[in-house]
Amino acid sequence: MSLTNTKTGFSVKDILDLPDTNDEEGSITGTEEDTEGSEATKTPGVLVQSPLENVQNLPLKNPFYDNSDNPYTRWLATTDSIQYSLHGLSANSQDTSAKSPEPSADESPDNDKETSSNGSDSGKKRKRRVLFSKAQTYELERRFRQQRYLSAPEREHLASLIRLTPTQVKIWFQNHRYKMKRARAEKGMEVTHLPSPRRVAVPVLVRDGKPCHTLKAQDLAATFQAGIPFSAYSAQSLQHMQYNAHYSAATTPQFPTAHHLVQTQQWTW
């Protein structure tokens, strides 16, 4: 008993100063707690025995202490209740996780019906295609050959003529452009950028009623006012133009009526 009075334990029994019921149990627990206390002094700050183990080692009933008013009586009744209280959350979570799919399984047919109905609606919407009549298709193709891009007023006007909406006309033009582009890509007939139409420069042979003997740079600049670069013509073509100018200047004095013909030709233009 002296050992039990001088011991310093961390169990509920020691904290509440409860007397021992059996000397053997007290001596055994006393020796165990003395050894644990000595080990605790060797390694301070480290608990060798957890409070849960101390609670499990306590006797179930104590004749010297009335614990009917103790709120922890039910908690200290059995070890099974302690383990259940510690692991109750995990068990409940497992039960709820196991039971949670049941309502979803019950509701799954409704959800499947809703999704199937939504899928059928979307499928019906996707399957709807505007069927153009032959007259509408002919008019659309004819207008597409004339003009591949339409403005908003032109689109509305064409839609009113063939009894369609502007959106339908717009979508038809987009699809037709894409179809034509894909057909050209498959055939390898991609249209290259065509050069702008070239204007032919006509040499000035007569100016102000007088024949031009030579073709000067100023005259060439006047003939190229249309924007055609000077490098577009080769030197051979320029020499040919100068030769024609010299030839016309040499032949005009031999025929005095040539000047008169040129003037009348100028008036007839």
UniProtKB/Swiss-Prot annotation:
Molecular function GO labels: DNA-binding transcription factor activity, RNA polymerase II-specific; RNA polymerase II cis-regulatory region sequence-specific DNA binding
Entry keyword annotation includes Nucleotide-binding: no
Stretches the record annotates as Disordered: 1-66, 91-130
Positions of the DNA-binding region: 125-184
Transmembrane segments: none
One GO cellular component term noted in the UniProt record for this chain: nucleus
Protein keywords: Developmental protein, DNA-binding, Homeobox, Nucleus
Cited InterPro entries: HD, HD_metazoa, Homeobox_CS, Homeobox_NK-like, Homeodomain-like_sf
GO biological process: cell differentiation; endocrine pancreas development; floor plate development; floor plate formation; glial cell migration; motor neuron axon guidance; positive regulation of DNA-templated transcription; regulation of transcription by RNA polymerase II
PROSITE patterns: HOMEOBOX_1, HOMEOBOX_2
Reported tissue expression: Expressed in a continuous narrow band of cells along a boundary zone demarcating the location at which two of the earliest nuclei in the brain differentiate.
Polar residues bias (residue ranges): 51-66
Subcellular locations according to the entry: Nucleus
Composition skew (Acidic residues), residue ranges: 20-37
Disulfide linkage: none
This protein's record includes keyword DNA-binding: yes
Role noted for this protein: Transcriptional activator involved in the development of insulin-producting beta cells in the endocrine pancreas. May also be involved in specifying diencephalic neuromeric boundaries, and in controlling the expression of genes that play a role in axonal guidance. Binds to elements within the NEUROD1 promoter.
Family: Belongs to the NK-2 homeobox family.
Protein name: Homeobox protein Nkx-2.2a
Organism of origin: Danio rerio
Encoding gene, per UniProt annotation: nkx2.2a
